[in-house]
Amino acid sequence: MMKKNKYSRELFIKYRKYVYTNIIILFIITFWSIIGPIVLRSVLNSSNNAFNTKNIAMYFGIVVLLYVTKYIYNHFKFYFTEKFKNNETVDLYEKVFRMKYSKINELEPTYITERVSLTIETVFSLYVSSLTGILVSCIIMIATLGMVFYINKLLFILYFVQIPLQYFGFQKLLNGENSKLAHYGTELQKLRATSNKNIKLILSDVNGVKQYGKNSIILDLIRDNLKKANALERTANTYAMSVCTVLEFISICLKNSSYLFIIYMYINGGVSVGDLVYLNLVNDIYYNCIGDVINIQINLRNLKGSLDFVSKEIEDNFEENGDKILSEICTISGSAENIGYGKENVLIKQGEFSFARGDVIGIKGESGCGKTTFVKLLNKFEESNRIYINGSDIMKYDNTSLREKVIYLPQNTYLLPCSVKDNILMGREVDESRWEKLLKYDFMTNILDKGLDKIVLENASNLSGGDRQKIILARLFMQNPDVVILDESFNAIDEETGESLFEILKAIYTDKIIIIISHSPKYLNHCNKIIEIKDKELIQFR
């Protein structure tokens, strides 16, 4: 049996009310399922008035109640499904957002998205749905065994021995926790997520698809990704089907043996007509329940892969978070020592820096020298114990409060698939006075003409480069940060538009810290401080 997992325990605690309700409704369904055949047996075994209206009405009344309860259960299940998937998908992404920056890049965001979807589907269907169903199956089996014991002791023994016989035979086939099914289940989830991720990345660049869509390399990439995933899926399914076929053969042999034995008992007067009808009704139900209980172990192998993804790839890679709330930033200082990606890839060996309110800092250096890596230390995307904000170690600050005050803008703007207004506000309450002031800026004219309700399409394909930057600038204004980091943010637009936006930004944030990474002297000439990274050394001028 699978070891307990922190994530699975959290889910049970959170949804125990729904799980218990689910179990209660299933108990009622189970009760009607059990009592119906018993009532029919009693009717058939009755020596007098066996088929009177009252007895027949009772039986059909039970059947009606059974299906009414099933109808109610289906509505409850659909409601529970919607609630669970909505809540847990959001909560799981919240966990993803707490992961280390480097780990998200290492796993790749699209891969993580695919694994999250697979995890939610697997956890819901197997942990929440199947396990409650197993409890009901066990109750049906116990009730059936009790009734069979009452009817015929020898038949009871035949029914009872099926459980250990099938269970231990199944365990032998699975070969314990480290079975092929466990390995296939985990590896298939990873490979399927990787395949879907790669295909989505290929299709995400519409320009590339249109330009090179008939190029064999693109189609070969899609084909290779599909082949790898589908080949493993075929291997896994073939093995699983082999196991299931053996189990099904054993189950059918045992079930048919039970039928033959029941008929034999009836012919020899060991059971009555009512007993014969009852046993025929419950025989399939009983063996299906045994199958449900045993087959859940196959499903638990898939569940294990999903739970391991949450615990080992997400939760074990949470970034460090301080508990000190940052209300404002007046100064940033520190030293850059051995900054990079491990001992073998050091980008900056040494250097000191110091910024204060009102500073506009330009950062220059050759491509790949560590400019972006350096600025990502300032918002804790990358970790360092040598950065100080207002004289305190940056690692002591709460990540959320820090990132509300330090805004990092990469070259590729981060726009969401929602309205322009929502992209500006980013879920914040509207500060009416600040909003009215924003709308009066000249750079907002073109955005207002096109409409704040305009929906941003994938990759912001319906917006010009200049409009994208203006939306980001408007978002900045509404966020009111203390530090703005521009990482070649204006490279996608012409210099005239970029310089105009930079002038606006400087005018708005005269008492803030502005940091710009750029190769263009036009932007660097606006700076009162310059940092150059050269020969793995960070040097601050002025």
Segments predicted by a language model, with ranges:
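Cytosolic ends of transmembrane helices, especially the final helix of ABC transmembrane type-1 domains
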Residues: 214, 238, 285-315
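Conserved "ABC signature" C-loop
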Residues: 413-455
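Helix-to-loop junction immediately C-terminal to a conserved catalytic motif
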Residues: 379-380
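An intracellular "coupling" helix at the cytosolic face of ABC transporter transmembrane type-1 domains
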Residues: 11-17, 101-102, 118-127, 131, ...
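Transmembrane helices of ABC transporter permease
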Residues: 18-31, 52, 59, 63-66, ...
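Juxtamembrane loop-to-helix connectors within ABC transporter transmembrane domains
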Residues: 97-141
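Membrane-integrated ABC transporters
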Residues: 1-33, 49-55, 73, 77, ...
